[in-house]
From Swiss-Prot:
GO terms for biological process: autophagy; innate immune response; protein polyubiquitination; ubiquitin-dependent protein catabolic process. Pathway: Protein modification; protein ubiquitination. This is E3 ubiquitin-protein ligase RNF166. A zinc finger (RING-type) spans 33-73.
Amino acid sequence: MAMFRSLVASAQQRQPPAGPAGGDSGLEAQYTCPICLEVYHRPVAIGSCGHTFCGECLQPCLQVPSPLCPLCRLPFDPKKVDKATHVEKQLSSYKAPCRGCNKKVTLAKMRVHISSCLKVQEQMANCPKFVPVVPTSQPIPSNIPNRSTFACPYCGARNLDQQELVKHCVESHRSDPNRVVCPICSAMPWGDPSYKSANFLQHLLHRHKFSYDTFVDYSIDEEAAFQAALALSLSEN
């Protein structure tokens, strides 16, 4: 019996380490950033709660005085956010099938592959028409302005999405005293294109840490929309 146990133990030691649970089908989901919903890119981990995000995705959270984890909403020390080297190693080791052509690709190269995969592009072209995440009785016009990108009110830099605008203004215009119009608010139905914020950076970090387009019913006024969007954002986490 002792010899049998010894042989079993020896065989177990020679077996390669198992990959993540769930097999190939759930592999990509296990390494998906909760913010951008894509495979991690340059992942970082919050020291206190251990949650992992793409480095760029977490950046806007690091610009506020008292940052909260986007996933669990617990406060964390921005100085204790470290590069998730163990996750990076796993991204380079594990393969998963492309969601379009089913070709197996290492997770570290999945974003690049998907961006050029003809099957994925074909699927995207055939996507159903957008519908709101919250039911609404209001009609959805087809000619609404594109609120996805904005221009910097300080220097005019264009094609910035909401997170990029926050990051750009914090990094490039932190000390700029000029009063400027918020391009995000002015694009809203209730927005006043002539109203200039006395402290635009504070306004940007307070009001625009989430996307209005994801949560807002545009038929209600600004304050009601903000409160509704904030409540829905919190309820989803």
